[in-house]
Amino acid sequence: MTGGRFDFDDGGTYCGGWEEGKAHGHGICTGPKGQGEYSGSWSHGFEVVGGYTWPSGNTYQGYWAQGKRHGLGVETKGKWMYRGEWSHGFKGRYGVRQSLCTPARYEGTWSNGLQDGYGVETYGDGGTYQGQWAGGMRHGYGVRQSVPYGMATVIRSPLRTSLASLRSEQSNGSVLHDAAAAADTPTGTRGGFVLNFHADAELAGKKKGGLFRRGSLLGSMKLRKSESKSSISSKRSSVRSDAAMSRISSSDANSTISFGDVDCDFCPVEDHVDATTTETYMGEWKNDKRNGFGISERSNGMKYEGEWANNKRHGYGCTVFPDGSKEEGKYKNNILVRGIRKQLIPIRNTKTREKVDRAIEGAQRAAAMARTKVEIANSRTAHARAKADAADQAALAARQECDIARAVARELSPDFYQPGPDYIKQRLQEGVDAKENPEEKVPAKPPTPKESPHFYRKGTTPPGSPEASPKYSRSPQPSPPKPAKKQNPSSGARLNQDKRGVAEEQVTAIVNKPLTSKAPTKEVGAAVSQSKYSGRHHVPNPSNGELHSQYHGYYVKLHAPQHPPVDAEDDDRSSPSSSALVHKPSPNKWSPPKSVTKPVAKESKAEPKAKKSELAIPKNPASNDSCPSMEREANSGPNSVMIVLVMLLNIGLAILFVHFLT
């Protein structure tokens, strides 16, 4: 057997022994472009026992077959470690995956790299699931046991987090960013608690205080009557069905399909549960959620037996409350839609009674089946732990073969660079830095783009914004403008178009500075003077005009031209400016029916300002006949708004009237 160093065309290198042109014995091989490293024993071109190190620092140490991980081995990826069997590159059949930072772990059977068969999953807060699995999800029969409510992990995301489950990382070991970013959302639930009923009397009043609440305006009169006459305990029972919401368990926080499990209307409100209370669910699971028949029971006496759908009470069932009262019937998304409630006259419906009884029997059978599956899962877990211990021995043997291969490589080629140890050192250094400076590892929220409109005031131009194209912008003439009493029709039309494009915030600016705060013209008036002004360049001349720093480059006259008052009135009637549209319609067109004198006072104050703003802008009587459509829009706009407001007011008064009568 000979040996040496061989460089591949793709940038990889093999340094070690070979036989008949194939790697044989001990050696080190790097991947394309020198990325990744395998060191260990070889047999006719294939890895046998050794370790592979990725550039990210993730490692595998164990047995190989036909170039794939096969047999027993240990994989370290990110904050997780898998110890157990491997089959053609995938995890399986028995193995244990555990977190390096929390108690989270899975022990059981695997298939194609996912949990499949029977197993036990322990979550970051100590809660457990024991039962059947399929395709990496809880599927079949199983038991979900929570820890005391005070110790349960607060899950703040509909996505799974690495604290709560095992399926929280990508293939390269990096944690999903969505799970970290969603920690800022207000949705907070306790792991393993789905029977979250808001039993507080004040919350009951708050829940039922809305105008359009269920049962107030168009609902049943009996519900309102029972609420007014019953005690606090009956209020609690009456609101349990309406306000109860589904809470995802801690295991549900990382499933790729566990979206929409939380009703955001009640997320910020926490139930008043004793810190020592625990909850257990025994029954059917489908696609990682409670689906089918099952029983959910709390240690304080609360219990539900019946049908489930997507972690919610859905179908027929019976709920027993801690005080001994109960409600039974048909549920739909945690709401009792048909059945028997406390303090209400029982519905004499034998079919409903029979369906409830059948649902309870089905739930009890499912719970019994789940308990038998738990026993099988525990036996599979014991076997998986034994395989994990054997995998540790295989990893130890792989490390020994790795050391031999490194010694052989150094002997054959002293200058050969072995990247594996550097990958591991870099990963360890990153871990130390993360512990010393945890605040640096917190991903900062991406800044809002600079072009976001809320970074600037209204009426101002963001810095760095491109200049308007000549097609839609007008620059003043190169020659210095002189004060003139007469204007040609084209300039008058351009100024009138300027008035129409004034923004809403210009009204205040014109009143205060009528000569220097003119807003930029809009594209509506650009077409009027396009042929005359589009090809000219802007020549600043501070002697005759003042350039407004907040708008585009155009001049505003320092001396307002004098016009007869008749022209201003005619122009006001023909082409109203935006300031006139802002101040006049509300007092003139519509006023509240109860107060008549106040709008008159506002009208008398608003007209001088509007006229003053109009007089501050040059006008041209020649353009009065050019905008009848603007006049119609100004007259029709406030009318439609007034009609809508009056209709809404009438509807609101009618609803209040009916509400008080009922």
Swiss-Prot record:
The chain crosses the membrane at residues 641-661. The modification Phosphoserine is found at S157, S216, S220, S452, S465, S469, S475. One of its GO terms (cellular component) is junctional membrane complex. The modification Phosphothreonine is found at T448, T461. SUPFAM superfamilies: Histone H3 K4-specific methyltransferase SET7/9 N-terminal domain (SSF82185). Signal peptide: none annotated. Keywords: Cell membrane, Endoplasmic reticulum, Membrane, Phosphoprotein, Repeat, Sarcoplasmic reticulum, Transmembrane, Transmembrane helix. InterPro entries: Junctophilin (IPR017191), MORN (IPR003409). It is a peripheral membrane protein; Single-pass type IV membrane protein. SMART domains: MORN. Its main location: membrane. GO terms for biological process: muscle organ development. Residues 228-247, 432-634 are annotated as: Disordered. It comes from the Eukaryota. It holds the Pfam family MORN. MORN repeats lie at residues 14-36, 38-59, 60-82, 106-128, 129-151, 281-303, 304-326. Residues 432-443, 600-614 have a biased composition (Basic and acidic residues). Residues 1-640 are cytoplasmic. It is found in: Cell membrane; Endoplasmic reticulum membrane; Sarcoplasmic reticulum membrane. Residues 584-599 have a biased composition (Low complexity). Coiled coil: none annotated. Belongs to the junctophilin family. The MORN (membrane occupation and recognition nexus) repeats contribute to the plasma membrane binding, possibly by interacting with phospholipids. Junctophilins contribute to the formation of junctional membrane complexes (JMCs) which link the plasma membrane with the endoplasmic or sarcoplasmic reticulum in excitable cells. Provides a structural foundation for functional cross-talk between the cell surface and intracellular calcium release channels. JPH1 contributes to the construction of the skeletal muscle triad by linking the t-tubule (transverse-tubule) and SR (sarcoplasmic reticulum) membranes. This is Junctophilin-1. It comes from Oryctolagus cuniculus (Rabbit). The lineage of its organism: Eukaryota, Metazoa, Chordata, Craniata, Vertebrata. The gene is JPH1.
